[in-house]
Amino acid sequence: MVTALFLRASHQTVRPTGLRQCQAAASRLGCNASLIPGVKKGQFPKIQMLSTSASKLQADTLDRTRNIGIIAHIDAGKTTTTERMLYYSGFTRRIGDVDEGSTVTDFLPAERARGITIQSAAITFHWPPQAAVNLIDTPGHADFTFEVMRSLRILDGAVCILDGVAGVEAQTERVWHQASTYRIPRIVYINKLDRDGAAFGRTVREISSRLAGYPAVCQVPWFEGGNGRFVGVGDAINLQGLRWQDGDGKAVKMFNLQELDGEEPGLAQEIKRARTALVELLSEHDETMIEKFFEHDEDHLAVPPNDILDSLRRCLLQEQGRKIIPIFAGASFRNIGVQPLLDAVTNLLPSPLETPDAEKKSVTQAESQNAIEKLQSCALAFKVVNDAKRGVLVYVRVYSGSLDRNSAIFNTNLKITERAPRLLKMYANDAVEVDSIPEGHIGVVAGLKHARTGDTLVSYAGNKLTPPEPLDTLQLRPIQVPPPVFFASIEPHSLSEEKKIHECLALLLREDPSLHVTVDEDSGQTLLSGMGELHLEIARDRLINDLKAKATMGRIEIGYRECPLGESPVVTKMFDKEIAGRKGKAGCTAVVEPFDPDNAPPVPEDALSVETKEGNQIIIIAPELQVETNRKGIEESPVLPPGLDMQSFRASLHNGCLAALARGPQFTFPMHHTRVTLTINPTEHLFGTDTTPAALSSAARLATSAALRDLLSSGPGTSLMEPVMNVIISIDEASLGAVVHDISSSRGGHIVSLDEEIPLTSTDLSASPQPVEDLPPIDPKKVYAPADPFESGSVGASLPDTANRPRTITAKVPLKEMVGYLKHLRSLSAGHGTFVMSVDRFEKMSTPRQKAVLTELRGGF
């Protein structure tokens, strides 16, 4: 049973009509259960704080822990809401302000200067005193999608904040779908209801149509006199009105339904309608609620608040079918509605006990129970930060056991063991040393030299350097890294600075794996690639201002790709040189050909290894290796030289081939849609102890590079590919025609849909099927939503077809045409248009377009 933290007030007994669809089920469900007594009148004082203590629960126990994130479109009020949460929980003594640069979670100089969140910040507070909330404030800008993705990976629940004026925006939909991939339960908080043009009812209907869920309206906005200023909320769960007093928002006056009937009759009726709709909706998805409804004589208002909270929680945790989305209201900047939102976090969102990681669970339920008993902790490194004072900090989420200070940590991805000399509990930019990080919690390990984002870390009992099977191969689901589409050159001020530049870049890449660094072999130029222009600008600021690198970043350009137009001749190359004072010799044969992931030819049956990554496919063929599997399940080959096992054999060839594919033969851009077949003949290509992993890797690189060059000299050549973006544009009805015409004619794009749900792409983490994709769309007219103060028509009426009606355009547009598009969109839409975009695919360019791009890249020559 979930402890109810919402305050209750006395309510009238009103008998509305029964459930429309559940009368026939009465006998089957057994309606003769005893009634649960209602709340007594006068149980609570008029003015008090909204949070109460749950004395039966001990502090920081796992079932009272919440790992939550704040997700939303940029400028929806994420950081503002977070600052109020910290203030009301007692963590801070004053409310931070985004405009003043005084917030706790936005502590980077670039964040305070720009007034946006760039880096997700973790902070722990208590609400009420016995419940621990580990909160992560995430960025809203599309350029920092990876920062959101790696935060979502370790969350148990999330609060999605919507702007009550703008409604459901494009980036909101995108992050919502990413959260759906990880099946994260979410509640929605409609913010900024104090602003002119705010429309709570319209936003609720947009949630049903654009976020593909059933809105469960738990609160309705309280406008003074029905259409005056926003002063509080009507609580449909506890049947009361909450009115915030002016000031810091700590003083709240509560009104029961009887009092509201006299002072605000319109609000009282709306609360009753909201409660009726809430019980009806829950009854359609939760059989227990049907039983409770009949136990209370089919009286919607008589169902106790605890039962409604329990039902909401059960519906939130359902994995199958369409989700119910609890809706709350407020205006964080005016200090209205944040405390009930905190109550909803602890009441409705799950604890770590209810969301175990699937990979860890499958291993701990395996047959090797003797090994499992030695597992002391299992954690995922989801973020790495280089702190000027504390050194490298690795943020971890502990999924099992307790991570203790000075324990040996085995990295199952890198196969290395490190010590954890210091453990920290982070409070944004401040830290407190702790002796351990318990299961279900988020903390920081300081002093790790090798751990990266996405690595799995395990500690185990015993003195062995590596843990026993299967712990040594346990890997939690990694964090997917989207492909970069912009790049810029990095030039050191002098040759003496070059080494430090590369050390600083290595730190940047460890912090942010969505950045990529490549070095041009011919010119020696270093290129930094990222997700967007702002992403690279922030990386430049971090490199130069924070890491004190003496370098200059060149102009930001688009990252094109190169693809083969046909098959290359068969090429064999031998590598015979000394590597670090040791002789190395190996050979390899390579063939390069086009590769279409959607229509790929069959893979040879004798293929030793097939790996498809970043649009390329690498096939390794070695039919004479005589590969066998031993009793431990490890592949062996008697033909391989001593000291070379099958795993390192495959990895060496694969890495060498990848190094060659990073640079195309004609335009020097990375290869894409390319299949490489590497063939190894043991009698011709392996030379005993001289064939080391480094020699094999070099041979594969030489053979692949030669095959790519032969595409130009004696083959069909290569073509340029450009990134095509999936663009979602939010505008009003009046601007629709101009924007559609601009996209389809001036920018060479094509319109995919108008006002439809965003299609998932590879960069939206669509690794698993969405649970709602086959369900019919929800009709917004059938969704309960309170009438907005200036809305005409009945409750739930569809939006009027006016010039201000919000519209959404989904289009496919070449990235080159989208550079600097925001300024142009604002001019077309009178300043109201916004857009987000993600990489959809790379597409082969036409000859005239390729010629124009090359001329531009060469400076007009």
From Swiss-Prot:
State where it is primarily located: mitochondrion
The chain's transit peptide is found over: 1-17
Intracellular or extracellular location(s): Mitochondrion
- Signal peptide start-end: none
What name is this protein filed under? Ribosome-releasing factor 2, mitochondrial
Instruction: Give the matching NCBIfam families.
Output: small_GTP
This protein's gene is called: mef2
Q: Which GO terms describe its cellular component?
A: mitochondrion
Q: Which organism is it from?
A: Aspergillus niger (strain ATCC MYA-4892 / CBS 513.88 / FGSC A1513)
The record's function comment reads: Mitochondrial GTPase that mediates the disassembly of ribosomes from messenger RNA at the termination of mitochondrial protein biosynthesis. Not involved in the GTP-dependent ribosomal translocation step during translation elongation.
